[in-house]
């Protein structure tokens, strides 16, 4: 995840809005449709900060235990982006059941709800580096869903790098030798781990911090964050081959 950190505390400003929304208004809904009602009860707390600044931790009331509710139905993506669709299906199948991976993200219902919102939001665009899979940047909003119990954040921009490992089918030799966790960078498993990594930046943990700390511009921290997700999700990621 990449996010600018410029600006000073003196310049920082906050504007907080509480909106009971009939639908999640923070991300375009034209690219995908779903029969799920899980986006019908979102409480959106919008925190606007000076450009380049962001809150270091979730809101005080963001960390909640997800209630025992049905897992949201999968999105029916209308995009022609087959890679995005297959990646979404892989990660949905990882998170839809109660297992070590979905529990890390707060339970299947919570994890799938936020995965759906992230998938609706991210767009395919080129970035400078061929090694970056996703980039999240800009201001973000804090959201609480009343049905699933999911509290999470969404950034202004979430980009899937069209020049990066998610989409590049013909990597150069040196690039092909790189890995995400234990998985070679252009494999199905690595792509799933990359999307799960981004999900970890959006959800709070039981300690009151984001599951994964911001790692924009810090390659070592990014690798550590991927290893954290891998520790909880490796069995489910490996099962994608079966």
Report each predicted region and the residues it spans.
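Predominantly extracellular/secreted Zn2+-dependent metalloproteases
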Residues: 7, 27-192, 202-242
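Bacterial N-terminal signal peptides that target proteins for export
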Residues: 8-17
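Bacterial N-terminal signal peptides
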Residues: 17-26
